[in-house]
Amino acid sequence: MVRIGYTMMTEQTGPRELVRDVVAAEKAGFDFSVTSDHYFPWLQEQGHAPYAWAVLGAAAQATERIGLMTYVTCPTTRYHPAVVAQKAATLQILAEGRFRLGLGSGENLNEHVVGGGWPAAHVRLEMLEEAVEIIGALFDGGDVSHHGTHFDVENARL
């Protein structure tokens, strides 16, 4: 079965317009809508990139059927994996089960803003693997403690 999606162009449109656009996409019959999770737009001329998680939360409340998803959220540098799990779990409740979390290792354009440098590719992949392990454990329920190579989590629960 073919599913047709709509991209919320966060680098080209403000947050209020993005929510109006996803409502229109739902009315037009699109099956899902995705958004990038960028701090900066790809090009300086594009203005600013709204915070994807606030836009998704507003879209979840403004729609009833359309699925919502992040293209790639990087749970390793700009966000801690436990915080990503909390954001995703909250959005899943707001969207009444319509949210899907897309994860990846990110890119320097958006992840450098919190400092700490830009790790080598093999390190970013290690970090992503560990982050996915933490997020999965939190989604599974119960208390989670994790003391790994890149991340620590102490008695966290969703």
What are these regions (language model features)?
Residues 3, 60-64, 68-72, 93-102, ...:
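Amphipathic repeat-derived elements
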